Amino acid sequence: MTTNATHACRVRPKFPEKWHVPNDPKMWITWRHANNKLAKEKVYWISTASRQGRPHAAPVWGIWKANRFYFETDPNSVKGRNLSNNQSIVVHVQDGNDTVILEGSARGEKRAERLNQLRKDYMRKYQYTPDWSNELNQIVFRVEPRIVRLEGSPNA
């Protein structure tokens, strides 16, 4: 599924028959379900890669808003350094039985209006007010998903 939400197509990947995965689109997870799951999740896992391709996975707090994922990190952390050289990223929720996986690219979010709104969102969701006044200490990344994978049961 792509995140052009109004024009998203639902495609069922091929599974081995022995897995008995339903081929009925009514049984597939809906975008509404995935969107709600992404919005309500507290801890997300991200995977980045170094310039040499070495993978790195880390848990982060984040905000899902308007089909974008936002998170903060220290620019000198492994994930911060990786993203400064390689913008490719994978984001997924913790629940392995009801999984939403995003693949895309991450760029620094610098729009003051968006950062002000995200600060409020962090406070509401985590009872935490971030300080993004100095990008040498914390940077906010915006993830633009290209591919969204949904796995599991919508009733999980």
Language-model-derived ranges and their functions:
Residues S84-I89, K120, R124:
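Short, intrinsically disordered, mixed-charge
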Residues N35-N36, W61, R81, H92, ...:
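Short secondary-structure boundary/capping segments
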Residues T2-I29, D98-A156:
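Charged, gly/pro-rich active-site loop segments
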Residues A34, K42, N67, D98, ...:
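A generic secondary-structure signal marking the coil-to-beta-strand transition
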Residues A34, K79, R114-L118:
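Amphipathic alpha-helical interface surfaces
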Residues E17-P55:
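Short, conserved active-site entrance elements at the starts or edges of catalytic domains
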Residues K42-V43, S88, Q127, V148:
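Generic structural signal for secondary-structure transition and capping sites
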Residues E41-P75, R81-L83, I89-V93, I101-E103:
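Short beta-strand segments
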